[in-house]
């Protein structure tokens, strides 16, 4: 009795599944032949297929490794004016980032002092000036703090950082002050 009920249920399942199987898509059998697409083949003796940017190479320049140090973002440009600094700070404030000021007394660049591999003492970490400026809404406040930092340490390198406190990452960093006589 139980076996007849089971077989009836199994037959009912198979009968119900049949219409669904009829509408199934055929399985993937591979890519079709590409002979339908017209292509042109270059001969192996054709040297024009070798990649070349010879026309552009002459206008590209390399950053000189001696004499000019790369400090931060925008450091390849002439020093930013007060108005340009204010615009950069306004940009980071518009993005909702927290402005921070940092300074370095000896080196404004990444350098290796104690080891050949990168580490804590290679110039990437600068000293923070006071605290991050949470709640700051005006670029003038940031520039006043920059002036205070320069007054306290006239021989320092100073940079402004935009910190995103939601993602907890540094989003922008640029050199705001180089001491007199710096390269």
Curated annotation (Swiss-Prot):
Keywords: Calvin cycle, Carbon dioxide fixation, Chloroplast, Photorespiration, Photosynthesis, Plastid, Transit peptide. GO terms for biological process: photorespiration; reductive pentose-phosphate cycle. The keyword Magnesium does not apply. Pfam families: RbcS, RuBisCO_small. One of its GO terms (molecular function) is ribulose-bisphosphate carboxylase activity. Signal peptide: none annotated. It is found in: Plastid, Chloroplast. One of its GO terms (cellular component) is chloroplast. InterPro entries: RuBisCO_ssu, RuBisCO_ssu_dom, RuBisCO_ssu_N, RuBisCO_ssu_sf. It comes from the Eukaryota. Residues 1-58 form a transit peptide. CDD domains: RuBisCO_small. Belongs to the RuBisCO small chain family. The basic functional RuBisCO is composed of a large chain homodimer in a 'head-to-tail' conformation. In form I RuBisCO this homodimer is arranged in a barrel-like tetramer with the small subunits forming a tetrameric 'cap' on each end of the 'barrel'. Heterohexadecamer of 8 large and 8 small subunits. HAMAP family: RuBisCO_S_bact. RuBisCO catalyzes two reactions: the carboxylation of D-ribulose 1,5-bisphosphate, the primary event in carbon dioxide fixation, as well as the oxidative fragmentation of the pentose substrate. Both reactions occur simultaneously and in competition at the same active site. Although the small subunit is not catalytic it is essential for maximal activity. This is Ribulose bisphosphate carboxylase small subunit, chloroplastic.
